[in-house]
Amino acid sequence: MTKRFKLKISRILSFKSCRLKDPSSLPFNPVSSSLRRTSPLVNSSADVTTVPQRRRSSFRLHVLTVFGCGRSSTPLDVDLRNSPVLSPPQTPTFQWESEGKWHVIAQVTEEEYETPRRKIYNGGSEKDNRRRLKKKEKSNSRRRGSISSAEEETDRESLLPSSTNLSPEYSSSELPRVTRRPRQLLKKAVIEEESESSSPPPSPARLSSFVQRLMPCTMAAAVMVEGVAVVKKSEDPYEDFKGSMMEMIVEKKMFEVAELEQLLSCFLSLNAKRHHRAIVRAFSEIWVALFSGGSGGGRRSSSFSSVRLSDYDEC
């Protein structure tokens, strides 16, 4: 079987190049070169013996027609000019496998070597997309509504008149209604409070009375200094407190008794108790230096006599 197939392949290759294409020059019953080689040898004087012609296979005839060789080449060419274009006949496909020996096997279907299909995720139609968007919008609106309702419940305030007396004679329709305060009013109230807190402080001459009524001592000190209190490590706190007090008195021109007392209370509130004795000593020296001379010195010094150093002993 393998030898016959090899012979057929050699014949196919030999027919690729034809010597003559003119039908007049071709013999009536052509014989292939391979058949001539296999035919028995005869003498020139003897009669020529004719070899029985073998029937050509359909595969061989198809190869001859494809390569344009043989008897049917020219009439086909003549007919094709006037006839419509015909599609070539389908040839059987073969697949080769090497398993020690070459042999022909049947055609392998695509299903055996078919690659696994991949999952195709369709984007969906426009209707599905619209439905999804509507669902998302509804869920978001519900969340917003729940949050806003919770906030509004916190903002509700019942406005009930104090003069009305609720008796059992009043029906449910006559009861005062619960009203809601809009958020804008709340925001305005917050803004007004912030503007009042950020308003500029009064002048230093009015600080003594204004600070005592409204602000703690720490805030009064910050307003008087118009700056920020600085933390400083000092080896001699007495001299440092004395120098800082003198600078503030000279810069702000604080020569009134109320202003000086406010300055002392601010220093005491901003510092720890262990520094109170040094603060009072420094302030007492400044007080004596300012009000020791003159007729009003005794009266002003008596007002400061209530402050005693024993009250500010170190802890």
From Swiss-Prot:
Residues 130-145 have a biased composition (Basic residues). GO terms for cellular component: nucleus. GO terms for biological process: negative regulation of DNA-templated transcription. InterPro entries: Ovate, Ovate_C. Its main location: nucleus. Plants over-expressing OFP7 show kidney-shaped cotyledons, round and curled leaves, small rosette size, late flowering, reduced fertilization and round seeds. This is Transcription repressor OFP7.
